[in-house]
Swiss-Prot record:
Organism superkingdom: Eukaryota
Tagged with keyword Transmembrane: yes
First-listed, main subcellular location of the protein, grouped into a coarse class: membrane
Keywords on record: Membrane, Transmembrane, Transmembrane helix
Protein name: Putative uncharacterized protein YDR521W
Annotated GO CC locations: membrane
Cellular location(s): Membrane
Other facts: Partially overlaps YDR520C.
Residue spans crossing the bilayer: 18-38, 42-62
Membrane topology recorded in Swiss-Prot or TrEMBL: Multi-pass membrane protein
Length: 111
């Protein structure tokens, strides 16, 4: 019985570490890289961070249905909302949003 408890704790710890790593890789890393370039790059890094997190989580946990809103399913991380906020300050980000949506759709259509 003790063996199964420790195995469960170890598994939960592994999942927790994986989540922290995915969060750093998909969101914080692009965010920090954007800080060193400019505010515009920060905005683009933030939006691409949401996209990368959606992509990583969908590929890792497909049963969670973390599709982006662009293909009609709820987004787990608010890709569209992030772009709407950022495009207030940087209108040219809308073109980036269209490019990412296009690439996202190509990714899931197997192109």
């Amino acid at each position: 019985m003790k063996g199964s408890k420790s195995h469960l704790v170890f598994t939960l710890l592994q999942v927790s570490q994986l989540n922290v790593f995915l969060f750093f890789l998909g969101f914080l890393l692009p965010l920090f890289l954007g800080l060193f370039v400019s505010l515009r790059s920060l905005a683009l890094a933030l939006s691409s961070g949401w996209f990368i997190m959606d992509l990583i989580l969908f590929r890792t946990f497909p049963e969670a249905e973390l599709y982006p809103a662009v293909i009609g399913k709820p987004s787990g991380l608010g890709l569209t909302e992030a772009f709407e906020f950022i495009s207030i300050f940087f209108p040219d980000v809308q073109q980036t949003e269209r490019n990412i949506k296009y690439n996202w759709e190509r990714c899931f259509n197997g192109e």
